[in-house]
Amino acid sequence: EEEDDDEDDEEDVEVDISKCKVTFDEDTHPYTGKAVKPEFTVSYVDEDGDDVDLEEGEDYSVTYSNNRKVSKNAKIKIKGITDNCTGTLVKTFTISKAKQKITAKNVSVSLSKKSVNLKAKCSTGTLKYKSSNTGVAVVDSNGKLNLKKKGKTIITIKAKASRNYKVAKKKITVTVK
């Protein structure tokens, strides 16, 4: 009986991780508030010229560093963990600023209320407000609307960029009746 040599050959292949190719599934890795662990593939080219993927946990281990904040220098360290898969490779990736979301709703309110709070929120917590028609309503730095007369105004709400978030802007309509 002949044995299938292909299985044995594959076991005998020695792979130096430092010569492997690392391919990220996504080009960008936005800030999440947690450790960023991008999806990636580690592969090598076999003697037939084909790409062969290695398996995390079977062929190599992964450790991360500098991967919690926006950085151009977040790192993945890939280390061979078998007799046939040895060596170490460090790959750098970038964590970009995340989009910031402002939550605020259009407001319809009676003039008799005199004032109302917009209750706007964002990722960084710091918001600036501007009323397009201060004759209808004036808004203070805390998002409190002081109602002046019946009508409509557009309130522009801005969140400044921060270390981890991009600038954001949202417009809401305030109707005073």
Please tell me what each predicted stretch does.
Residues E1-E2, F93-K97, V174-K177:
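Interdomain boundary/hinge segments at the C-termini of tandem beta-sandwich modules
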